[in-house]
Design a protein with these regions (language model features):
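Short, well-ordered loop/turn and helix-capping segments at boundaries between secondary-structure elements
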Residues: 16-20, 54-58, 86, 149, ...
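Structural signature of PLP-dependent enzymes
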Residues: 27-46, 52-81
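A structural signal for short secondary-structure junctions
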Residues: 42-43, 95-98, 124
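Active-site-proximal structural scaffolding
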Residues: 4-6, 42, 73, 109
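Conserved PLP-binding catalytic core of the aspartate aminotransferase-like
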Residues: 61-119
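PLP-dependent enzyme catalytic core of the Aspartate aminotransferase-like
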Residues: 82-86, 108-153
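Active-site PLP attachment segment
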Residues: 1-25
Length: 153
């Protein structure tokens, strides 16, 4: 997803109904509304992308920003693995430096992820998938310490 365009008709709706029959009726109405939205998707995002890719100066700026983000994420990946080295965990997490993209599968267990959340306020999904792009380079040592504590103990 190289063009992340947010606030474009996204969201969630949660419905609580007093009984199953009402829930079926509500679901039917919501499905009808959703079909109309899906049948006519917004064109704004496509127009923005077309304008950027159609203008050499804008395209060059976008490519430069994209490369900057790619390099930043790669640096964060390497930095985390390096920060884990003093804990004897660089081999165990070497795959993190080799992966690509904004997210990484850490290999942490659901219990380790829970401990990171509860004991160190480190948040990721239960599968161990982490948002590398959201890391702060100045806090990689702190993160490595927390990971080491849940992996060793």
């Amino acid at each position: 997803k190289n063009f992340g365009l947010y606030r474009e008709r996204t969201g969630a709706l949660i419905v609580c109904a007093s009984d199953a029959e009402k829930l079926v009726d509500i679901r039917s109405q919501l499905a009808s509304i959703a079909r109309n939205l899906w049948s006519t998707p917004p064109a704004h995002g496509a127009a923005v992308v077309a304008q950027i890719l159609g203008d050499e100066e804008l395209k060059a700026l976008w490519l430069d920003e994209l490369e900057g983000m790619r390099l930043r994420v790669a640096s964060l990946r390497r930095g985390l693995v390096e920060a884990l080295a003093p804990h004897g965990l660089s081999e165990r997490f070497a795959h993190v430096a080799e992966q690509r993209g904004m997210f990484s599968y850490t290999g942490l267990s659901p219990l380790q992820v829970q401990r990171l959340r509860e004991e160190f306020s480190v948040y990721m999904v239960g599968s161990g998938r982490a948002n590398v792009a959201g890391l702060d380079a100045s806090r990689l040592d702190q993160l490595a310490d927390a990971i080491a504590r849940v992996c060793v103990n």
